């Protein structure tokens, strides 16, 4: 099985699992249908499964057209009335089998109130939608900042070699903010230089080990990150207070 990012809109990735022997394709968060249809038809594949992380249109907008094209396609997603056409509603603690893959469902509210992620422990793969980005994290929409903080603490506990398949290409801009927070962090500086030199614009998947060294939202216990937060209005150096300031500062960062 092969995993590929299929680009959608300006910076979305629809992660696709391709099994050419079986002639099937599975995908995560198809915000657009056309890129998936083109890819499937050009590679003579049938869409078997759709995995959804949350209700935002750039993640679910292609579902209607895709299930019209492939009526037998299974659609997994969180229990949320804002998401239509989910054939298999799922929640924390359940598992989903996609071919030979067995995903554990993680409840990760914060970005939205019902956000979930798909974690495959045998492969070490995490499909985290808009909860975690490389060097960053999602904004808070209809979830809470406390929930988002807890969701990222959960990710910190995953094995360090876990590959992180985020839904957007935000890495370079996130690294610029990370450098503002920790100007002396050599991991941030070196990684920024690395991706500026690479020929491909795609910086994903990341991994938990890398994120623990470059992502300020996973580094709220580090002294320089705490000092940045305190100098920008944090009430204390408590992890949640630091996290709140980081998210607020990132919201207006240019």
From Swiss-Prot:
The keyword Zinc applies. Pathway: Secondary metabolite metabolism; methylglyoxal degradation; (R)-lactate from methylglyoxal: step 2/2. Binds 2 Zn(2+) ions per subunit. GO terms for molecular function: hydroxyacylglutathione hydrolase activity; metal ion binding. GO terms for biological process: methylglyoxal catabolic process to D-lactate via S-lactoyl-glutathione. InterPro entries: Clx_II_MBL, Glyoxalase_II_hydrolase, HAGH_C, Hydroxyacylglutathione_Hdrlase, Metallo-B-lactamas, RibonucZ/Hydroxyglut_hydro. Zn(2+) 1 binds at residues 54, 56, 111, 130. It comes from the Bacteria. Pfam families: HAGH_C, Lactamase_B. Belongs to the metallo-beta-lactamase superfamily. Glyoxalase II family. HAMAP family: Glyoxalase_2. This is Hydroxyacylglutathione hydrolase. It comes from Legionella pneumophila (strain Corby).
């Amino acid at each position: 099985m092969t995993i590929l990012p299929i680009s959608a809109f300006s910076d979305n990735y629809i992660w696709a699992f391709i099994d050419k022997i079986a002639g099937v394709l599975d995908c995560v968060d198809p915000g657009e249908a056309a890129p998936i249809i083109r890819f499937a038809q050009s590679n003579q594949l049938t869409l078997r499964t759709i995995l959804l992380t949350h209700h935002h249109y750039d993640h679910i907008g292609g579902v209607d057209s895709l299930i019209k094209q492939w009526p037998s396609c299974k659609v997994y997603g969180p229990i949320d009335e804002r998401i239509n056409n989910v054939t298999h509603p799922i929640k924390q603690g359940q598992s989903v089998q996609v071919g030979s893959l067995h995903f554990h469902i993680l409840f990760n509210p914060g970005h939205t109130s019902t956000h979930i992620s798909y974690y495959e422990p045998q492969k070490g793969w995490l499909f985290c939608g808009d909860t975690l980005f490389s060097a960053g994290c999602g904004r808070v929409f209809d979830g809470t900042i406390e929930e988002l903080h807890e969701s990222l603490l959960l990710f910190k506990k995953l094995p360090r070699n876990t590959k992180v398949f985020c839904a957007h290409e935000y890495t370079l801009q996130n690294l610029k903010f990370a450098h503002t927070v920790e100007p002396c962090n050599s991991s941030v500086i070196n990684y920024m230089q690395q991706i500026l030199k690479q020929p491909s614009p795609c910086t994903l998947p990341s991994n938990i080990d890398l994120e623990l060294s470059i992502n300020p939202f996973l580094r709220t216990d580090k002294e320089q990150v705490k000092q940045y937060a305190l100098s920008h209005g944090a009430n204390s150096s408590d992890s949640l207070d630091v996290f709140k300031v980081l998210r607020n500062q990132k919201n207006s960062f240019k």
